[in-house]
């Protein structure tokens, strides 16, 4: 068991160098970017993988009847660039498209411009996963993406983006305006499936990893596998952006099944391909072993009764796993993965008494400051910790000061500018000294907000996009209001509103006892009638309820009743 007071693998003060654009970062972080530069790799005689065109790879398998495209990236522009690259190598006609998982399906329309009836294959769960991230939890998901993938960070200077772990950027700036070209798969599977595609035998094996709909794709005639299991960095059991639990045991099964294929070539959803049975076998073995190590040791420590803060200090990967970049902490860090494994298995309570009924914020911070001897003593301790590169302690102390008062939006995040700067400095200390792209990007994004260089408030409110709402029936979007209900406004209201869409469809929503639930149209005493297009405009903040009523594009059974009902929701356009 490791008994060090610090967890050196998460960040190592004093290990900072300057990158090519003036970025301050760990040398391994800067070195990792070289693996992610745009390169079209030839994989055997019949396949190519384009790395560095975007966050993910676009890969191509040539069969007797044409070219199979695997993953289409974030947007049509990304896929169009990939097509241009592959056309330098082969003129084979497009024969099919396959999705490895739902993250990289946004550029498919670019393929249909070349072949309108292109067959598309993918897991049956892709659509549900896409829908899951676009509705109720959208602000939290978006904010997580902004932090993890450096979306608001500068491109140059000490705080400049180096990479995002699995790629050099979330979206390649050359691909603006990032046109969404997702097309659903028409050939789906949810279990092992065999097919003939482009004249090649193809086998699909569901293999959940960072997505429940991931699949390993095996081309037995080519001895080639395409996967989303083995990444160019230690697997992210925990994603700092916020994700559901990824059970390492499920991932390990997928890796073991993939290893049994005995591939000569291995293409990933991210990073350079691997070739040679021996190298692939060793990388696959070490990858699954690194993940099992984290799971096994977390369980061992939990069984012994250690709290989470003890467990993270007790578990570090053996030095052996630093031999190859695929098991290095270039994306996330072990101590965060350990926390996720523990909470995934046992929930948030780690048997530390202090966590059972903690004093809520901001009162907790106020009590800690008082107990420490007051603001000046806390500030002096922070400054001493910063001088000693003790960034863990500096962050904890500075967070007391920043979170000791509520801001105008009600969050405990209103500390004095000088204290926000102290916290920003401590976070930068971590960011410049970690191998983890996730940690660097999260810490710098927060530091830039703390010191006033950026404003992230727009990511803390629901900002519905009309084009996203319009992709589904209007009746579905009414249900999204559930998570915007303000109980203090609803009070003891028990009322049902029926929304009638003049171009087809209607839905009822009931407010009762502080919740909004699906309603029964027979119980609706209040009605709102309008075209779905105008409803989408209201949800997206392009049209207010009052303006819709004044312009006559919305009609009600009683204006005041509808206004009173919709005022209960935290959406400005429904309150004005």
Question: For the regions a protein language model found, what residue spans apply to each?
Answer:
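Conserved beta-strand hairpin/beta-sheet module of binuclear metal-dependent hydrolase folds
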Residues: 37-90, 215-229
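Accessory terminal helices/loops
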Residues: 2-30, 138-142, 151-159, 163-175, ...
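Metallo-beta-lactamase
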Residues: 66-68, 74-76, 131-206, 250-262, ...
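Feature captures hydrophobic
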Residues: 384, 388-396, 412, 420, ...
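Active-site metal-binding motif and surrounding structural segment of the metallo-beta-lactamase
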Residues: 65-66, 77-122
């Amino acid at each position: 068991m490791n008994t060090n007071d610090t967890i050196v693998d998460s960040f190592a003060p004093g290990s900072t160098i300057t990158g090519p654009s003036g970025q301050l970062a760990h040398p391994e972080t800067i070195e990792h970017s070289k693996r992610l530069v745009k390169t079209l790799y030839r994989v055997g005689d019949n396949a190519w993988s384009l790395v560095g065109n975007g966050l993910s790879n676009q890969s191509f398998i040539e069969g007797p009847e044409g070219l199979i495209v695997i993953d289409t990236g974030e947007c049509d522009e990304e896929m169009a660039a990939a097509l241009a690259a592959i056309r330098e190598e082969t003129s084979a006609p497009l024969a099919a498209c396959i999705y490895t998982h739902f993250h990289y399906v946004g550029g498919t329309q670019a393929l249909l411009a070349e072949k309108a009836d292109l067959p598309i294959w993918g897991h049956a769960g892709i659509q549900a996963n896409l829908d899951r991230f676009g509705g109720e939890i959208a602000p939290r998901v978006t904010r997580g993406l902004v932090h993890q993938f450096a979306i608001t960070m500068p491109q140059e200077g000490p705080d400049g983006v180096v990479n995002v772990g699995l790629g050099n950027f979330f979206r390649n700036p050359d691909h603006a305006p990032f046109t969404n070209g997702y097309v659903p798969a028409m050939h789906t599977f949810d279990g092992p499936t065999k097919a003939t595609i482009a004249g090649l035998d193809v086998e699909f094996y569901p293999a959940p990893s960072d997505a429940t709909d991931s699949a390993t794709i095996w081309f037995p005639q080519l001895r080639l596998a395409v996967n989303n299991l083995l990444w160019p960095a230690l697997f992210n059991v925990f994603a700092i952006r916020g994700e559901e639990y990824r059970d390492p045991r499920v991932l390990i099964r997928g890796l073991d099944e993939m290893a049994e294929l005995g591939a000569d070539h291995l293409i990933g959803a991210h990073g350079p391909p691997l070739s040679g049975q021996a190298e692939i076998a060793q990388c696959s073995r070490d990858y699954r072993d690194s993940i099992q190590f984290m799971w096994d040791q977390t369980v061992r420590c939990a069984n012994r009764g250690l709290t989470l803060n003890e467990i993270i200090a007790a578990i570090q990967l053996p030095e052996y796993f630093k031999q190859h970049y695929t098991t290095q902490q270039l994306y996330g860090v072990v101590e965060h993965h350990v926390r996720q494994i523990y909470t995934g298995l046992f929930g948030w309570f780690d048997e530390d008494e202090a966590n059972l009924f903690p004093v809520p914020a901001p009162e907790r911070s106020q009590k800690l400051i008082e107990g420490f001897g007051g603001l000046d003593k806390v500030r002096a301790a922070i400054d001493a910790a910063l001088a000693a590169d003790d960034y863990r302690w500096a962050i904890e102390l500075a967070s007391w000061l920043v979170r000791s008062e509520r801001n105008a939006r009600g969050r405990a995040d209103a500390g004095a500018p000088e204290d926000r700067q102290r916290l920003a400095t401590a976070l930068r200390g971590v960011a410049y000294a970690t191998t983890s792209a996730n940690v660097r990007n999260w810490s710098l994004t927060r530091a830039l907000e703390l010191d006033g260089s950026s404003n992230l408030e727009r990511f803390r409110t629901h900002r519905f996009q009309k084009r996203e709402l319009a992709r589904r029936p209007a009746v579905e979007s009414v249900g999204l209001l559930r998570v915007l209900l303000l109980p203090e406004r609803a009070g003891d209201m028990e009322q049902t509103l029926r929304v009638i869409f003049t171009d087809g469809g209607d839905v009822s929503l009931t407010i009762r006892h502080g919740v909004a639930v699906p309603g029964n149209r027979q119980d609706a005493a209040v009605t709102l009638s309008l075209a779905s297009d105008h409803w989408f405009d209201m949800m997206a903040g392009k049209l207010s309820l009052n303006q819709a009523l004044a312009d006559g594009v919305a009609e009600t059974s009683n204006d005041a009743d509808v206004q009173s009902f919709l005022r209960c929701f935290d959406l400005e356009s429904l309150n004005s």
